[in-house]
C-alpha cells in the first residue's frame, strides 16, 4: 500500500458559490469522507484557510526570515487535501475523481515517499 496526497485546487478568482451550492458541496464531501473511512483507505483530511493568510518561514540562513502570504505568488492554491492509503495509482485516480466531483474542483494526485528502512 502507498499513501497518496489528493490535493484540492482552486483559484482566488473563483467566485464564492451561493449558500445552497456550498451546503450541497459540504454534504457531498462529508459523504465522500465517510466512504473513504468505511473502506479503510482514509488516513487524514482537512480544508485549508485562504492562501493569503499563510506565512513562509525560511530558517536556512543565519537569520530567520518570515514572509507574509503564500510561497508562490499565483492565483491557484490548495484549498484542502486527503491523505489516503491505496494499492496503486489507478486506485488513487479513481478516488481523486470521486473527490473532485464532491468538492467541484480539480484534484491533484501525488504519491508520498515510502518510510525509509530502519538502519541495521
Regions found by a protein language model. Give the residues of each.
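Conserved, structured core segments of small domains
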Residues: 1-120
Amino acid at each position: 500500500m502507498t499513501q497518496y496526497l489528493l490535493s484540492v485546487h482552486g483559484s482566488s478568482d473563483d467566485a464564492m458559490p451561493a449558500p445552497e451550492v456550498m451546503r450541497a458541496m459540504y454534504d457531498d464531501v462529508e459523504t465522500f469522507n465517510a466512504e473513504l473511512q468505511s473502506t479503510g483507505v482514509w488516513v487524514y483530511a482537512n480544508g485549508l484557510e485562504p492562501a493569503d493568510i499563510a506565512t513562509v518561514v525560511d530558517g536556512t540562513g543565519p537569520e530567520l526570515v518570515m514572509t507574509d502570504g503564500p510561497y508562490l505568488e499565483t492565483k491557484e492554491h490548495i484549498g484542502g487535501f486527503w491523505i489516503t492509503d491505496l494499492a496503486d495509482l489507478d486506485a488513487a485516480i479513481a478516488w481523486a475523481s470521486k473527490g473532485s466531483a464532491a468538492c467541484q474542483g480539480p484534484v491533484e494526485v501525488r504519491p508520498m515517499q515510502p518510510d525509509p528502512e530502519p538502519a541495521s
